[in-house]
Design a protein with these regions (language model features):
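Hydrophobic alpha-helical positions that pack around
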Residues: 243, 257, 261
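NUDIX/MutT-family hydrolases
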Residues: 139-141, 280-281, 296-300, 307-345
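Active-site segment of metal-dependent pyrophosphate-handling enzymes
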Residues: 258, 266-307
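Nucleotidyltransferase catalytic core that binds NTPs
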Residues: 1-203
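Short histidine-centered catalytic/ligand-binding loop motif
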Residues: 240-251
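N-terminal strand-loop-strand
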Residues: 198-242, 269, 303
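Short, well-ordered beta-to-alpha junction loops that form the rim of enzyme active sites
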Residues: 122-126, 231-232, 297
Length: 346
């Protein structure tokens, strides 16, 4: 059997560091093939794990730490020495690409320690590969691995209990983890959400055009706190969210946001909202919601300083801004990113 870790014959010189970026939700056999190929061209491979510190969803079912562990296990299983593998965890920044690029660069530089002998590993296959052009300082080494396999296909089989199909698509170490996770309470929650979302999308599949849903949300701040609600239904059960929802047929966006703020939090109607409107913005990242194409218009209401108003709804709470910004994994969809946007504006 050919040694998949030996340098490629007649190839370019071996780089000190390689960088391979992905979400790996979960890592599959094509990911492993790319990594093994890369390790024939570089001394050490820095694996950048995206969508870190996000809430578990059917699209992002595993934590960055879990993905790191199973990647390390599958590479060790393939005969790769652990010191040759380095990891970086990077959050999603749906509305600030510069922050994402900066976090990738900082994470990589923490390992390279000033070395410029860095190559970026990847395959430009569609619009999702745009990031490969975003690091001009790193030589681009295209992978020769060609595969139709995707993590989406693996997840679909996993949440539809086709575990035999899953075993054919992932390395043994990954399959062992998935079988164990399949018995965990987290899997049951994710499976319930997967089934809910599938039925939700099925309900409008016969529409003449794919629907675009319109929602309005309120970011309400007061004395260093932000008003949040804890979702009690699917999708996103027990996740923190801004109060908000679908726009009614006979109301403006602002009216919808104010109605949802009061209705979901129990904020006293004597507290004005419209006069405390500080800013507003449309958030339309195409994949921001697993329910389907959803565009939201968010309004920032700044209630100034003073005692925190009483909230009569049991699922509503005031959270210190520092705590909210430090815990993106607690939030539903892109709500953390939306709140972060308004807070960064000052």
């Amino acid at each position: 059997m050919r040694d998949m870790t030996a340098p490629l014959p007649g190839s370019r010189r071996r780089r000190t560091f390689g960088v391979y970026i992905g979400r790996f939700e979960p890592p599959h056999t094509a990911h492993l093939e790319v990594m093994l190929e890369a390790l024939r061209s570089v001394q050490k491979l820095i694996i950048v794990i995206g969508s870190a510190r996000a809430a578990r969803t059917p699209k992002n079912p595993f934590t960055a730490e879990e993905r790191q562990d199973i990647i390390a296990a599958m590479l060790q299983e393939a005969g790769i020495a652990r010191p040759r593998i380095l990891f970086v965890h990077v959050r999603d920044y749906f509305y600030n690409e510069t922050l994402w690029l900066s976090e990738v660069q900082r994470g990589v530089q923490a390992h390279t320690r000033g070395s410029s002998d860095v190559a970026l590993i990847g395959h430009i296959k569609d619009e999702s590969s745009y990031y490969l052009r975003s690091f001009p300082a790193w030589e681009f080494i295209p992978t020769h691995v060609v595969s139709d396999l995707s993590a989406t296909t693996v997840r679909r089989a996993y949440f539809e209990d086709r575990l035999g199909d899953v075993a054919d698509m992932v390395p043994p170490a990954v399959n062992a983890f998935l079988n164990t996770f399949h018995r965990a309470a987290e899997y049951a929650d994710l499976r319930a959400e997967y089934d809910y979302l599938r039925e939700y999308r099925e309900s409008w599949k016969d529409a003449p055009f794919p629907p675009v849903f319109l929602t309005a949300d309120g970011v309400v701040t007061r004395s260093g706190h932000v008003l949040l609600v804890r979702r009690d239904g699917l999708p996103g059960r027990n996740r923190l969210a801004m109060p908000g929802g679908f726009v009614g047929q006979q109301e403006t966006l602002l009216e919808c946001a104010m109605r949802k703020v009061r209705g979901e939090s129990g904020l006293n109607t004597a507290i004005p909202l419209d006069t405390q409107l500080r800013s507003q913005k449309v958030f339309d990242y195409p994949d921001r919601s697993l329910r389907g194409r959803t565009v939201t218009h968010a309004f920032h209401f700044d209630l100034g300083i003073g005692q925190l108003p009483v909230l009569s709804e049991p699922h509503a709470l005031w959270m210190p801004l520092g705590d909210a910004m430090e815990r993106p994994e607690l939030f539903f969809e892109d709500h953390h990113a939306i709140i972060e946007h308004f807070l960064m504006r000052g």
